Every structure is written in C-alpha cells, then in structure tokens.
Amino acid sequence: MSPAMANPRVRKFNPIAFTPLPVTFITTIVYLAVLILVLVTYLVVPPAPTLEMSPKGVNLTEAWRDLQHLTEGFHPYNSRRNDDVHAWLLHRIEAIVRESASADGGPEVFVFDDNLSNLTYSNGGVSKSPIVGVYFESTNIIVYIRGSEDDPQNWWEWSNGKPKGKGGVLVNAHYDSVSTGYGATDDGMGVVSLLQLLRYFTTAGNKPRKGLVLLFNNGEEDYLNGARVYSQHAMSNFTHTFLNLEGAGAGGRACLFRSTDTEVTRFYKNAKHPFGSVLAGDGFKLGLIRSQTDYVVFNGVLGLRGLDVSFIAPRSRYHTDQDDARHTNVDSLWHMLSVAIGTTEGLVSYTGTDFDSKTTDQDKVNSGDGTLGIWFDIFGSAFAVFRLHTLFALSVTLLVIGPLVLFITSIALSKTDRMYLFSMSKSLGGASETVSLRGLRGLFRTPIILTVTTVIPIGLAYLLEKINPYIVHSSQFAVWSMMLSVWIFVAWFLARVADFFRPSALHRAYSYTWIFIVTWIMLVISTVYANQKGIAAGYFTFFYFAAVFLATWVSYLELFSLPRKGYYARQASRRQKRRSSSLSSRLLTPSADELPSDIGPNGAENVGDPDETDPTESTSLLRGQRTTFANYRTGGDDWVTEYTAEDEHVREASIFGHEQSWSWTLPRWTWILQLLLLAPIVIILVGQVGLLLTTAMSQIGSDGVSTFIVYLACALFSTLLFAPLLPFIHRFTYHVPTFLLLIFIGTLIYNLVAFPFSPANRLKIFFIQEVNLDDGTNKVSLTGIQPYLTDTINAIPSAAGQTANCTQGPFGSLVRCSWSGLPPRVVKEDPGNDQTMGPYTWISYNITRTVGKNEARIKVSGRNTRACKLKFDNPVADYRISGSAVDHRLPHTSRQGVAEIRLWSRTWENTWVVDVDWHSNPVNPGESKDGDEKQDVSKNELSGKVICLWSDNNESGVIPALDEVRLYAPAWVAISKSADGLVEASHDFIIQ
C-alpha cells in the first residue's frame, strides 16, 4: 500500500498554502521587512555627500566649521556672546558676497544690518487674563539676493517704496540660543544652512529667478521677537512665501513640522530626503503642542505662505548644554541643508501666480489663498501631497462604494446559493430534513479578540503610568516592544483556542468583515473632522480602509469557488442515508470514534461535496466533474458526482484540520494577496504616524505633561498596526508567539523597575535665581517633577541644612522648590575689576506721576544687561515706550489690561522710558503669582516691581548657584532655563 493510501490526509507541501508553516514564515518576513524599513527611516540619517559629490556652490566642511564656531558658547539675546555672533555673521556674509562678486554671472546681493527697527506689541491675551506687553529693538541681519525677474530698482530706498512684480521667498533662522544651550540645532544648523544658501544662490549658474531674502533673526527664544520686529522692515512687504528652519531636538532628520497649504507644500517634494507628516501640524491646531516658532508670525501676522522645518528629537537635549556640535553630526546638517536647497530652489524658480493674487485681509501681503493639504513621506525617499478636499471626496466615495460592493457581492453569492457566511444549515426542498453547514463558526471571534487585545495594552498603559510613568523618556522602544509582543501573543492564543474548539474555514472572511466595519467607522470620524475642523491627521484611515475593503472583497469572491449549498446538502444527505443503511446491516454498531472522518456524531456528513459518494451497484458508469472555482457546472437534482479513492484522498487533503468539508475547493493562495494588499500600507502609514507621535511626545513628562497619552498611543497603534494579522494568526505555529511572550515578560519587568533617566536621556530641571534688591536676599528655584526634583536638591551643598519651600509649578505636575542660594555676581565695577557691586546698585529707576491723573512715567535701566521688565500688581490700561513704533497688526494692549511689560534693547545698560496709565480700580490684598503678598493700596495707586534680567552664562563664577547645580546635580539631570533670565533682580514700587 502506498503512503498516500495509508494516510488519506497526507498532503504535498505547498509553500504558499494557507497552512501554518507558510503563513508563519511569510507573514513574519513581510512584517519584519517593512517594519525594519520604517525604523531605519526614523533612526538612520542619510549620509552626507563627499566634497566631490556635493552640489555646486555647497561646502559642507565649511558649514560644519561654521557650526562649531557658532556653538562655542551660549549666545542668548541678552549676552555679550550674542554680539560676537552678530559681528561674526556679518563677517561671514560679507566674505561670501565678495567671493560671488568676483565671479561672473553672480546676482546682486544687498545686506541689511537692521539696527533701526523697533516695535511695541503684546501676546494678544489669553481668555480673560491680562496680557504681556513687549518692547523690542532689532539686531536682525537681512540678506537680499535679487532675482533675475525682480524689480531692478532699489525700491526700499524710497519713502513708502513698494516692490513691483512677483513676491520673493523668505528663508529664516534665528541666531540666538537659550541661556542654557549652545544652540547647535536650535538654531545653529538653520543659521549655517542660510550661509550655505547664500553661497549656493550666488554661485554662477544658480541665480534665482525670484528674489530670495535670508533672515538671520535675533530674539526668537524669548518671544519670537526677531520675527515680529522684522515686520517693520521694508523686505517684509516683498516676500510672499517662506521656509522657516528650526530645531526642537538635537539631531536626526529635519522634519516638515507644518505647512500653510497644499500649493506651497508641493515644493517640499524637491527635497532629496523628505521627512514629515501632516500629523505634527494638526498637533498645533488641536493645541497639543504648546511651543511656537516664527512660523506663526510669518503666516499669522504677515500673511506669508510657507513651511516649518525642524529637528524634533530628542527633546531631552533641547535647550540644554547637550545641544552642541558634539551631540549632532554632519549628516543631520546635510539633511536640513538639502531640504532647504531643494525647497528654496523650487520656490524661487516658480513662474506661476499662485502666491501673488490678492487676499481678503488688506493688512497682509497679497500671497493668495491656499487650500488645506495632506502630506507625508514614504521611507524618507518619496513624498505624497494632495488637497484635503480631495481626500474628503475620495473618503465619502469609498464609504459608499465599499459597503455597496460587498452588499452586491453578497447578493450574487446568495443568488448562486454559495453564501456560506451566516448560514447555519441548508434545508432539502420543502422537507424537514436539514444539513448542517456550520457557517456561523467564527462569527464573533474577531471582535472578542480585538477587544481583549486592545484592552490589555491599555491596562498596561495604566500600570506604567502608576508604577513607572517616565520610563518612556529613555526607553521608548522597550515600551513599544512590550505593547506589540503582548498584543500578538494574546491574539494568537485566543485565536488558537477558538480554532481548536470551533475550527472554521470562514475565519478569514469574518475577520476581514469585522475589520471592515471598524475601519469604516474610523474613516467616518476622520472624514467628519477633516470636513468640519480641517484636521487631516486621520489621513491614514482612508488608505487603511481602502486596503481592508479590497482584502475583504477577496474573501467574498473566494466563496464563488465553493459548491452550491443545495447541491452540497443533497450529496451529503444521500451519502448519509447510504452509510446509515450499510451500518445498520452490521452485527455491531461502531462507536462515534469508529465512524469515518467525514461522518459527524449526528450522522450528518462533515465533508459533503458533489464528488465524494462511494461507488455502489447503482452508481453511474460516468464519473461526474469536480466542482471548483474554475470549473463548475450546474446539474439537476438527480445529478451525482463520483470519485475514485485517489480523488477522495485529494479532497480530504485539501481540508485543513477539522474545518467544514465544503471548504476543500477554496483557493489556498489568496491569503498572500490579502496580506500584501493590507499589511505593507498599514505598517508604512500607521507605523510612521505612531513613531512620529511617540518620538515627539516620549519626553513630555519632564515638562509636567502626563505620559499616559504616550502609553495610550502605543497601545492603540499596536492594535492598528497588527489588526491585519487577525485573519491569519490562528494559522501561526507556536514558535513566534512563544518568543514574543518571553519578550513581553522581559520588557514588562524592565519597564516597571528600570530607572527612567540616563546621561543620554536626561531629565530637565529648570533653574532661576531671584534677588530682592530691597533687602539683599536671594532664592534659587528649581522646577521639575517629583520625586526626582527632591533628589536633585538633596545633592546641592548650599541646600543642605535648609528646608526647601516647594509649591505647585507653572504647569501640570511640575513642582517649584526654592532655598537661599549662593549670591550672583552679575554686575562688576568695571570689566577689569573683579569686585562685585552691591546689589542695590544693579537697577536704576525713577517714577514720576502726572498730577491729577492715573498716569506715570517710569524710567528704568540695569547694569550689565539689556533686558528689564515691569510687573504690576494690577494691570495697567495702556502703556507707551518712548521712541517705539506700533503696528495695528500687532496690538500692544487689550481690554484685559497689561500685567507685565518686557523691555529689550540692542544697547547695553539702556534707559527705557515707559508711560503707563491705569484705571481707578480698588485693589484687594491677596497672593500674587509668585507667592508674595500684594500691597493694600488705594484705588488711585499703582504698585508692582521693577525687574532686570541677566542671562550670560559663559563665564564661570558669575552665577555661582547655577555652577553649583550643574556640578552636583546627578548625571541624569540636565539644567535648562526657567524664564528669560537666569537671574532676575527686583525692586518693589508704589505710585501714590
């Protein structure tokens, strides 16, 4: 007897069959391959080209040396080093311009060292709160490269001169850093990219068609001051589009952070290595991202249309001493520079009129009106961009067509009597006899598995939030590994248990149907948000649903390969009767275990098929045809199909396990088509969004924001990422799930017990020192999250023996703790004398009240500083700065009044003259924002503080308290600024 005859269920190995080994191997390979590509895109920066391969006019070696020089020290606006950087930039610009002037064919270049513009404005108010007023003096450097199609006249030299022709292109970067960071990525790389753009577009052969303005702005870190005061320069009326280069991380790839519209975003496709998603822009719209960039000024105030490109990770180095050249690399610099070159070249070469038509707002430049767009990169090599309205139309169409196609297909299946889905049994004519089809098996399996596999990761998110909430700060991928591994193992375990007890050939069809329903609902929600709120972050749901629809349709089309239900039932009934007659003639009736494999316990046939009745004396001599997907013929009620023993073995070998016997004609390869239709696009789009979201938010805990939203995102995106496995996972062998179970156990233990911070992923603690010049006392304050803030303070020698006064911080879970610290030495008698002046001499101020009116003039000046401010216990109604410009586009006051006036000067030890007037409102004693008791004054009096700021942290010993904190704080702590100044000194005042 041959082996096949000995074991009728032996089947030849088919490498693409829907059986455990091919399913496990192929699915694992597909997921790993695409996931690795997605991870490589996020973790590996494209290498910088060699000098020989660099674009003509670009010198990366020079750019890197410029970055090293720029980041030699801290250079905030209120520092001497900032003046040095300003002078160095002018020198570098002039050198590049001289080189281009010596070459033939170079464009005209004009350099504006803007030391005239100034502006008074405000933050516009928040709800009913008083606003903050600002006076700022410009030290911006503006470089204009005249385009070949620009107005040849120097129109900016005329009184009220305006440019003719098409608008130019603005590329912006700020050259100031924070007082605690060297500014390599925030925004040194942007600055040196501007220098290289200047070299590139002044090189022969690269002359721009439209004018290009390079803005080296100063003062972004303190209040976007540099961009706001740029609005007072003539060039702000010339530019219609912009590219803003920023940094909110410390390397990696430069990400397209946000964009004003579809039309301008299309120019980003010129970038050699595009990277970004519309998700980040919607984060700003929804208020999830609180920090801002110069983008809001260029677009919101001036009306320019453009792009915001920024480094986004790791945020633990952002605004710290690790934002330096040592912690980044030339590859990241090249990525930003290549993006800037590609995008800018496209903008300055554009000949259309999209950015030159009139706008409805007369206060803004005539840059036209754009359309909301959707954009995302694919593996950092390709870039997709299209209108949000287009996606809305496609989504609505698909929401209607998808269910309609499946409904029509279901009707066709019912008409041809092959709709096994939702079919429990089939009646034989009008008789009471029925044959079981077991078509409901697996109907509710997928929603149960989907629910459990979603709930468990969410439960783990709660667990991490309670036990070790900040582990994601340093171990994002450990959290991802935990979530993904538990999802796959639980899904496999539940699917295998269900398949063991109730095997079903319809598992795939039912799984896809449920996923179709869930993604249909997701697309409805996404479409509503896109239409009503302009939110495009759910763009991936369209592609997700489209792929699910196609995969589901394949499962429905597969059913056409099955025998007609009536035909199957008649054949099963006949065979049952013949076998029952044969069995009744035996002396001994066999037990259920002795029955043939195709006879169920109730006598019904388990493997009914048109071709499987045993030959008898009455059997026709002609064997009937097999019923297959490709070769099916209908017959009358008396038509009978017969098979040889060999055919019977083939049929039985085509049935997997104990699944329904009618399933033997189902195609065995279509699962691969479904996998390839759905899995890659889901991994690419969902994986991209998930990684971008968690990468940008993994370190928000140090800012006082709850990390639960990060863990919740990991949990939900795990479900979205691996839901395409549900139709196949019951076929997996135990090897991969068991391995993932071990991964889950290991990562769970690690995530629960590991210390969340490290020298490579430090916790940010925010520093400020406040000096009361009236009594000479000072307090050092650190702001951070507990219990790590207390651990840091306990390591500081000057805090030993003192009880720190801790209060609720400015946001979320932040706590602020203060103690009496080492006195600062920010003011000296003269540059050559180390003797520190008494604190009472640091600020000079004079207040003169207008007789009979609630008006006063305040003159204030600080030693060794160019930044001061006035804080009022009750808001003033209005204020004016002597010699300042005002702009109705940037109101300087509001109905709520002004609680604080910030004063910035380009001149050291400047004297500001501020006129204020206030309403006659009674003042009740209470607690001020900083905890100091308010003074009880009459309704015609005004009280407050005169404060000056010191931010220069380049010389050791000037701020001993900061030096001490940096020296003794744990290695896993990074010190960042808490406010505009590192040291703030104040006098109280009362105007009577």
Swiss-Prot record:
Keywords associated with the record: Glycoprotein, Hydrolase, Membrane, Metal-binding, Metalloprotease, Protease, Transmembrane, Transmembrane helix, Vacuole, Zinc
Pfam family, one: Peptidase_M28
A cellular component term, taken from the record's GO annotations: vacuolar membrane
Protein residues bound to Zn(2+) 2: D186, E221, H319
UniProt membrane topology term: Multi-pass membrane protein
Side of membrane Cytoplasmic, spans: 1-24, 412-446, 496-508, 555-671, 730-736
Glycosylation sites: N59, N115, N118, N237, N805, N846, N954
Cofactor binding note from Swiss-Prot or TrEMBL: Binds 2 Zn(2+) ions per subunit.
Site (Transition state stabilizer): residue numbering on this chain: Y318
Enzyme class, broadest EC rank: hydrolase
Residues involved in Zn(2+) 1 binding: H174, D186, E246
Highest taxon of source: Eukaryota
Any GO molecular function: metalloexopeptidase activity
Vacuolar face of the membrane: 46-390, 468-474, 530-533, 693-708, 758-992
Region (Disordered): 579-620
GO biological process: proteolysis
Active site: E220
Transmembrane segments: 25-45, 391-411, 447-467, 475-495, 509-529, 534-554, 672-692, 709-729, 737-757
Coarse class of the protein's main subcellular location: membrane
Cofactor: Zn(2+)
Lipid metabolism among keywords: no
EC number: 3.4.-.-
Function of the protein: May be involved in vacuolar sorting and osmoregulation.
PANTHER family reported for this sequence: METALLOPEPTIDASE M28 FAMILY MEMBER, VACUOLAR MEMBRANE PROTEASE
Family the entry assigns: Belongs to the peptidase M28 family.
Name of this protein: Vacuolar membrane protease
